[in-house]
Amino acid sequence: MSVLLGLVVGALTVQFLRLGAADMLAAPALQRENYRGHRLPTAGGVLIVLAVLVVEAGRAVLGSLGVGHDPGLTLARSEVLFAVFGFGLLGLVDDLLGDGSSRGFRGHLRALADGRITTGFLKLFGGAGVAVVLVATPGFATGRRLLVDAVLIALAANLGNLLDRAPGRTIKAAAIAYVPLALLLGTGAVGIAIAPAMGAAFGLLGDDLHERLMLGDAGANVIGAVLGLGVVLGRGEATRITALVVLIVLNVAAELVSFSAVIDRVPWLRAIDRFGQLPERRGA
């Protein structure tokens, strides 16, 4: 499977699943109010998780039948599967059980100091654990590299969530980040491994923009984690350190300022952010 084919298959699969899961997404337990007070399904990003599973299962079946030249489940594809399921599960728990009363690192730490463990804290703690497991596999260095790579993946996942404050924002940011990453990864094993997940994310852009569903943490965290994993698996130390610094800056900035306020003050960022959104939002 090529990178382009992986993107296309991921996008088509997630749309097929969205149509088939319409009744499930309409369940009262999944309905939440968005920033405009509209009620729509949250945790729509779980469709990305399911799409990756369907694509990988399909590749396995076709490979067993001798169709194509699939080498089997590579290490990179195994890592993507674990990342998607791990971060997807943690995000889903927060989507379904979180009350939104505590936000950001400081909010979760304040709640912990008060003797409360929030679902957001569980997601952050669990996400760090998933990231460590991802990089603590044969072929990875130990010590400093393990720490750098685990923090990079965890912060990338968290940034995906931090950006998910307006329709399409996380997916647009992911597309902007994915283009240079895809060029750097080329047609190698890592580029092919992350393509179905990214294709599935891009396949939900229209639904996110038109407010047919919300990605939720189950989707936003997964998108960020897959991009972070792509950097970790496919690039050298200089690229990883650069990405880590950028992620640290953005995660810290999110604790100090509102990304939405910054975007609204910068014309070109505002234009990108609102492109494709419903007219009511564009005129806001």
Question: What do the PLM-derived regions correspond to, one by one?
Answer:
Residues A261-A284:
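Short, highly charged, low-complexity non-transmembrane loops/tails of multi-pass membrane proteins
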Residues M1-M214, A218-V257, A261:
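"…together with the soluble PPM/PP2C metallo-phosphatase catalytic core" -> "…together
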